[in-house]
UniProtKB/Swiss-Prot annotation:
<feature type="binding site">
    <location>
        <position position="36"/>
    </location>
    <ligand>
        <name>Zn(2+)</name>
    </ligand>
</feature>
<feature type="binding site">
    <location>
        <position position="68"/>
    </location>
    <ligand>
        <name>Zn(2+)</name>
    </ligand>
</feature>
<feature type="binding site">
    <location>
        <position position="33"/>
    </location>
    <ligand>
        <name>Zn(2+)</name>
    </ligand>
</feature>
<feature type="binding site">
    <location>
        <position position="71"/>
    </location>
    <ligand>
        <name>Zn(2+)</name>
    </ligand>
</feature>
<dbReference type="GO" id="GO:0008270">
    <property type="term" value="F:zinc ion binding"/>
</dbReference>
<dbReference type="Pfam" id="PF05907">
    <property type="entry name" value="CXXC_Zn-b_euk"/>
</dbReference>
<dbReference type="InterPro" id="IPR008584">
    <property type="entry name" value="CXXC_Zn-binding_euk"/>
</dbReference>
<comment type="similarity">
    <text>Belongs to the UPF0587 family.</text>
</comment>
<protein>
    <recommendedName>
        <fullName>UPF0587 protein CG4646</fullName>
    </recommendedName>
</protein>
<keyword id="KW-0862">Zinc</keyword>
<keyword id="KW-0479">Metal-binding</keyword>
Length: 163
């Protein structure tokens, strides 16, 4: 079992906090089988609030379960409880871990941010729900503070973590 952290980096303009709408946020990931190295071409969605029970060895189920098409190995991924963290203005421009995945047989290799982010603008400004970061940049107008808010140069990477 390997723990993998999803790190993001972005330049924030008049934004105090960027976070997923966990536990209902769907992380869209491309995965690689740790056994044979086969990498999926399709996006798989993993949501903390959803569990699948494909394996009789784990009655609680998993957040994600798949069988490798190449080697037939059964792989699963869970989102580590309470591992979700916001990306804040203090983090702007640097990579920060926002969620940790517990991986058994499959590892994430690519992340697509898509819709479902929450943005809190600076100085107790407007809250934005269901923000779509699929274009890697997002701009809106904060009517409460009469200024623009934005997220630019969104990037992500995965890092292996020690337990």
């Amino acid at each position: 079992m390997v723990r993998v952290g999803l790190q993001i980096s972005a330049t924030l303009e008049n934004v105090d906090k960027l976070e997923t709408s966990h536990p209902d946020y769907s992380f869209f990931l491309k995965l690689k089988c740790s056994n044979c190295g086969e990498q999926s071409d399709k996006w798989h969605d993993i949501t903390e609030s959803e569990r699948v029970q494909q394996d009789s060895r784990n009655a609680a189920g998993f957040n994600f379960f798949m069988k490798c098409k190449m080697c037939s190995r059964e792989n699963s991924i869970d989102i580590v409880d309470k591992s979700n963290a916001p990306y804040t203005a203090d983090d702007s421009g640097a990579f920060k871990t926002i969620v940790v995945f517990e991986c058994r047989g499959a590892e994430p290799v690519e992340f697509s941010p898509r819709v479902g982010w929450r943005v809190s603008s600076a100085e107790n400004g407007q809250q934005f729900e269901e923000v779509d970061l699929s274009e890697d940049d997002w701009v809106e107008y904060d009517q409460k503070n009469n200024n623009s808010v934005g997220i630019y140069e969104f990037a992500s990477k995965f890092i292996k973590l020690k337990k």
